[in-house]
Amino acid sequence: MDAYRAVVDKRDQRVYLPKPIPDEALRRILQAARMTGSSKNREPNRLIVVTEREGVRALAALSEWGRWLAHAAAVIVIAQVEPHEFDAGRCAQNMMIAAWADGIGSCPAHLPEAEVARLLGIPRDVHVNRVIGFGSVDPVRAAAPKSVARRRKPIEELVHRERW
């Protein structure tokens, strides 16, 4: 899948097949994170990869809105000593696009930072910035017609040239 197709076709996925992510696919996801550009080339992102079922389920139990994570094959937490929202967002998007290109679905989740940190043994001076679930998607479900939620505003409504 080329980069453009991966970007425009990607959809958040919260339903996964009950199988692990192949090691090579997970390695590519992590490599995409590692190669993410960062402000002043600081490389602030640190990744905690959770694949053991007990840990994945414990993360899912931290928030009503994160319950779907219980079925993820992996949860990756982006942590930073100094919070850099922009850099964390770039890293998250790189991982999710790389995953989608390999047929792996993903979706960010909002979990309480302090509880994630406690559960994963993250030091007090390190900030939990993003939590993302990953898993193999049903190819039929992934190829289904785009839902109403996936429709986007026309480009003419979003883009202004030269001035507002």
Predicted feature locations:
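Acidic, surface-exposed loops and disordered segments
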Residues: 1-164
